[in-house]
């Protein structure tokens, strides 16, 4: 609870004053009154609220009796020498009035509007101070020029916990570089590892720690009471709980598909309009989502920021990295409700579901053949064109599919990533391992039969 804030005015042509700020009172006292006069006038301005022993009593007026423009409670001469502008610089902490979320909730609408008006004028004058510093070449004494000082003030406002107090204040301050980013929703803080962008530096720093595996808030301690899923923050739980409500608040006006979040429906509507506002600077390919464009750019740079700690394999996408980690742990969290088959990634489960439904939405325009996967259709098209864009660097053999090239490269490297857990035999392809594992199942179930497992393809051959 703020018990008082006195903003000193500036007068005279020399020096800039450091505003005097009253100390914060006990936060437990309820705010009852909030008054102000416009700050930075010829008289001292007072922003006060009632507290213990201060009900309805404002601070005493200041007396501008010194030629340097300083104000004093008592009409006595200024005994201090004229201070340099560097010593009397205006500090953001000196003029900022911070309410806790509980205190802010106690204010009525008129008090909040009054507070915003005071802070808006305060910020304008702080920006003016920064401009004056620059005009007087005082920024030579600082590491940053006056322009950056003004931006620093606004940045401090943006990073405040009480966003509800400062958000509207900052957005209405003119001639500030950060103002454009705030009002348009642009995010100036970009992660150099994955390209994800954030509004605040604090969120960016927290995100960078996630790449290193460090958890600044410890383990996930906030649990969803309905499904038992854990989250690292309360907002994460609240956002997740919306999906349990079963009542999506947003609906596509074109197809009627429902969504829980506004940004989701906006992103979905681009599939109808064909809008792709995000373009790759190198090849010009366009995307509907900014994140997809950033991920695509890694195909040009070859960047693979995600590395597996078990085998050292690197990945370009976080989803591919997480799916790969499950090959080491054996985790298959996505289960089919019709046949109980489990998968390590949701995409595989979705494709598997088309087997039961028989749905094949992707059709070749040349021959009419339909596919359940878009990637399968793309691979099929190469059979019509004869194009083989994927070429092996070691033997110059070309392939129509990228996956076929990767399988071929294992011949040169000798890599056999698919290993049988029972006998240790390894294979270059997962399908070969699956065939081999069936031989163990047949041996276990038919040990009394005349069965001879053949090494050819890992399949068993019955002897008549």
From Swiss-Prot:
Tell me if Mitochondrion is a UniProt keyword of this record.
no
Location comes to: Nucleus
Annotated PROSITE patterns: KRAB (PS50805), ZINC_FINGER_C2H2_1 (PS00028), ZINC_FINGER_C2H2_2 (PS50157)
Residues in C2H2-type zinc fingers run 189-211, 222-244, 250-272, 278-300, 306-328, 334-356, 362-384, 390-412, 418-440
Keyword Transcription regulation part of the UniProt annotation = yes
Name a biological process GO annotation: regulation of transcription by RNA polymerase II
Q: Which pairs are disulfide-linked?
A: none
Please indicate which superkingdom the organism of origin belongs to.
Eukaryota
Source organism of the structure: Homo sapiens
Q: Give the UniProt family note.
A: Belongs to the krueppel C2H2-type zinc-finger protein family.
Q: Name the UniProt key words of this record, in alphabetical order.
A: DNA-binding, Metal-binding, Nucleus, Repeat, Transcription, Transcription regulation, Zinc, Zinc-finger
Per its UniProt record, what InterPro entries does this chain match?
KRAB, KRAB_dom_sf, Zinc_finger, Znf_C2H2_sf, Znf_C2H2_type
Query: What's an example of a GO molecular-function annotation for this chain?
Result: DNA-binding transcription factor activity, RNA polymerase II-specific
Q: What does this protein do?
A: May be involved in transcriptional regulation.
**What positions does the domain KRAB occupy?**
90-176
Entry protein name: Zinc finger protein 669
Pfam families linked:
KRAB, zf-C2H2
Query: What does the entry list under GO cellular component?
Result: nucleus
């Amino acid at each position: 609870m703020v018990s008082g804030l006195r903003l000193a005015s500036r007068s005279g042509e020399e020096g800039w004053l450091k505003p005097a700020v009253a100390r914060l009172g006990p936060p437990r006292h309820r705010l009852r009154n909030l008054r102000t006069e416009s700050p930075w006038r010829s008289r001292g301005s007072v922003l006060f609220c009632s507290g213990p022993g201060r009900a309805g009593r404002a601070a005493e007026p200041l007396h501008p009796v010194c030629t340097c423009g300083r104000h004093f409670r008592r009409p006595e001469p200024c005994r201090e020498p004229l201070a340099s502008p560097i010593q009397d610089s205006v500090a953001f902490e000196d003029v900022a009035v911070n309410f806790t979320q509980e205190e802010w909730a106690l204010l009525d609408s008129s008090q909040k509007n009054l507070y915003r008006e005071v802070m808006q004028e305060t910020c304008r004058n702080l920006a003016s101070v920064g401009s004056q510093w620059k005009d007087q070449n005082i920024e030579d004494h600082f590491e940053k020029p006056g322009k950056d000082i003004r931006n620093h003030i606004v940045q401090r406002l943006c990073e405040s916990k009480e966003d509800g107090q400062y958000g509207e204040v900052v957005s209405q301050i003119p001639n500030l570089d950060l103002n454009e980013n705030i009002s348009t929703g642009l995010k100036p803080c970009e992660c150099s590892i994955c390209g994800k962008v954030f509004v605040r530096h604090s969120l960016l720093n927290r995100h960078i720690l996630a790449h290193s595996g460090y958890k600044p808030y410890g383990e996930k301690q906030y649990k969803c009471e309905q499904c038992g899923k854990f989250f690292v923050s309360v907002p994460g739980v609240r956002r997740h709980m919306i999906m349990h409500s079963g009542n999506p608040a947003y609906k596509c006006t074109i197809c009627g598909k429902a969504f829980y979040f506004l940004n989701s429906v906006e992103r979905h509507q681009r599939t109808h309009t064909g809008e792709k506002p995000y373009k790759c600077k190198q090849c010009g390919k366009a995307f509907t989502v900014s994140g997809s464009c950033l991920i695509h750019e890694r195909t040009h740079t070859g960047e693979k920021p995600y590395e597996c700690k078990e085998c050292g394999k690197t990945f370009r996408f976080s989803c591919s990295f997480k799916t790969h980690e499950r090959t080491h742990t054996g985790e298959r969290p996505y289960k089919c409700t019709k046949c109980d088959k489990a998968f390590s990634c949701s995409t595989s489960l979705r494709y598997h579901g088309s087997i039961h439904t028989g749905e094949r939405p992707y059709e070749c325009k040349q021959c009419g053949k339909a596919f359940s996967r878009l990637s399968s259709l793309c691979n099929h098209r190469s059979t019509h064109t004869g194009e083989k864009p994927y070429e092996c660097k070691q033997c110059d053999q070309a392939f129509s599919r990228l996956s076929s090239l990767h399988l071929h490269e294992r011949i040169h490297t000798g890599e056999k990533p698919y290993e049988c857990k029972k006998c240790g035999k390894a294979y270059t392809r997962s399908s070969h391992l699956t065939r081999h594992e069936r031989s163990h199942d047949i041996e276990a179930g038919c040990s009394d039969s005349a069965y001879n497992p053949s090494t050819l393809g890992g399949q068993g051959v019955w002897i008549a």
